[in-house]
Amino acid sequence: MNETNDNDIDQLIYLFSKLPGLGIRSARRIALYLLQDKDIRLKSLINNLVEIDKKIVKCEICGNMDTENMCRICSSEYRDKSIIAIVETVAELWAMERSGNFKGLYHVLGHNLSATSRQNPSILRLPELLTRCFAENIKEVIIATNSTLEGQTTAYFITEYLKEHPAKISRLASGIPIGGELDYLDEGTVSAAINLRQPFE
């Protein structure tokens, strides 16, 4: 496909190419797919995005994304409210939910800490986490940050931060490969990592 001179189409391709996992070639294919059946494919996508923009909010408790200020996980009476899993982003929360093996609550950090940069730890929402641990009488905190250098740095920082709370602190099992991110692992691997979690000090 030759480069187009249409700036609007160029912009559409550029926006798609910025999505995770997509390069410029994949972005071109997606744009062409939508434009070839504009009345159905493109309009359906636009309508869905408009609805998502209107309805989706961040859970005021855990940081998940849902249609209510308290997400369906936090509000569910069937979850084990004595356990919290700490994840870096909503992507990792979704990965644990797909495993079907975790029935506790979550706390989404939204970021991680780099061992080489001077990021402010306040970005991790840890005061809110500590408040939840005391208010909800949490018995176990599972640190489910990724097995990257940043994830490990974040895990150690969280452990130090939570020392004043008596909850058991555990880490997902080492079956997750070094440098691995939960969102890219299959459900069986994530499920095993949850089951085989180890105390973390």
From Swiss-Prot:
SMART domains: TOPRIM. Disulfide bonds: none annotated. GO terms for biological process: DNA recombination; DNA repair. A zinc finger (C4-type) spans 59-74. One of its GO terms (molecular function) is DNA binding. It holds the Pfam family Toprim_4. Keywords: DNA damage, DNA recombination, DNA repair, Metal-binding, Zinc, Zinc-finger. Residues 82-177 form the Toprim domain. May play a role in DNA repair. It seems to be involved in an RecBC-independent recombinational process of DNA repair. It may act with RecF and RecO. Belongs to the RecR family. This is Recombination protein RecR. It comes from Rickettsia conorii (strain ATCC VR-613 / Malish 7).
